[in-house]
Regions:
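General beta-strand structural signal in soluble alpha/beta enzymes
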Residues: 102-106
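Glycine-rich phosphate-binding loop of actin/hexokinase-like ATP-binding domains
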Residues: 122-181
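Short clusters of small/polar residues that mark proteolytic maturation junctions
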Residues: 29-31, 79, 151
Length: 332
């Protein structure tokens, strides 16, 4: 039985554990703040601790940003503080110190692999995983094979334009999905609408008074006030639901998945709202057979399962599916 050191690295949190190819975690899951400016050192420190627990056979990492899986480094990492860190080499220091193979994957593609191997795929041949976090990202796995794209940048689903006439944008993309529906986008959209929608700008609701008093505006605040009956917050979330359906519908028409799983903080904390909105509006935007929609059963550990799915994918340990040479080769 192989023992794999697993790392689920996010922009904010850094999770680690030891797992086996069948999906079992054999050590406690540790969680700490991500230290992007010393990420290599942070990995090495945790690996030292893991080596004292088990004799490790490999290291698998799910990481955000622009990832070069073949070279084993992160090309670009955007920190929560807005810094851009370029070229974080993860493979070389690990191989040099521990002499272990290292398998690295972008967190969105890795999450889709985690769903394929360890989620609720059942008998579906094709799935999409969507993460609604600070932004929106995702991955596609079709018949066991992840879609990475020409330069391994596939999965930037949050940059699909769902409102091309809008003034809002993300990463320079006008009307980008995540500019409205992500953890960062929801409050930005609400603030923009409050400034530009004459119907609501003078409304004396709890929500608009909160904004007028310069109280904190965040996605949780929007959901909290909507649940309390605030008409403006409810109106905003109703429109956001349609934008979500437009994004998911576009993906369905492009990839025809049998299953779409949803994860990330916005989804995990607002499951009923997200699923109800998609079920209500998806037929407006989806021509192909509608997929099964479900919250990911992997929860907050999806990054770790994604790392383990990456290990399975790269080593060809995929039961019942023939793996082509390009997928079964290591990233050495």
């Amino acid at each position: 039985m192989a023992f794999v050191a697993l790392f689920g690295i996010g922009s904010t949190n850094f999770h680690a554990t030891i797992g086996t190819p069948n999906g079992d975690f054999v050590s406690d899951v540790s969680s700490e703040p991500t230290q992007p400016h010393r990420l290599e050192t942070q990995l090495l420190e945790r690996l030292e601790e893991m080596q004292s627990l088990r004799s490790l056979d490999a290291v698998a990492i799910s990481a955000p940003g622009l990832v070069d899986a073949e070279a084993g480094h992160i090309r670009k990492f955007d920190t929560p503080a807005g810094d851009l860190i370029e070229h974080i080499d993860l493979r070389t220091p690990i191989e040099s110190r521990f002499d272990l193979p290292v398998y690295l994957e972008n967190d969105c593609t890795a999450s889709a692999l985690g769903e394929w191997y360890f989620g609720r795929r059942e008998d579906h041949d094709s799935l999409i995983h969507l993460t609604f976090g600070t932004g929106i990202g995702g991955g596609v796995v079709d018949r066991g094979h992840p879609l990475r794209g020409e330069s391994a940048q596939a999965g930037e689903f949050g940059l699909l334009s769902v409102a091309p006439e809008s003034e809002l944008s993300s990463t320079g993309v006008t009307g980008a999905w995540e500019a409205f529906c992500s953890g960062r986008g929801i409050p930005e959209y609400v603030a923009h609408r409050l400034e530009t929608d004459d119907e609501w700008s003078a409304d004396e609701s709890v929500f608009t008074r909160r904004v007028a008093e310069d109280a904190e505006l965040s996605a949780p605040v929007v959901f909290e006030d909507a649940k309390s009956g605030d008409a403006f917050a409810q109106s905003c979330l109703a429109q956001i639901s349609r934008y979500n359906a437009a994004g998911v519908g576009t993906l369905c028409n492009a990839f025809n998945p049998g299953l779409v799983t949803l994860g990330g903080g916005v989804a995990l904390n607002n499951e009923e709202w997200l699923l109800e909105g998609l079920e209500r509006h998806l037929e407006e935007f989806c021509f192909v057979d509608q997929p099964t929609l479900a919250l990911s059963p992997l929860g907050e550990n999806i990054g770790l399962y994604g790392a383990l799915g990456t290990y399975r994918d790269r080593t060809g340990r995929q039961p019942g599916v023939e793996v082509p040479q390009s997928a079964s080769s290591t990233t050495d």
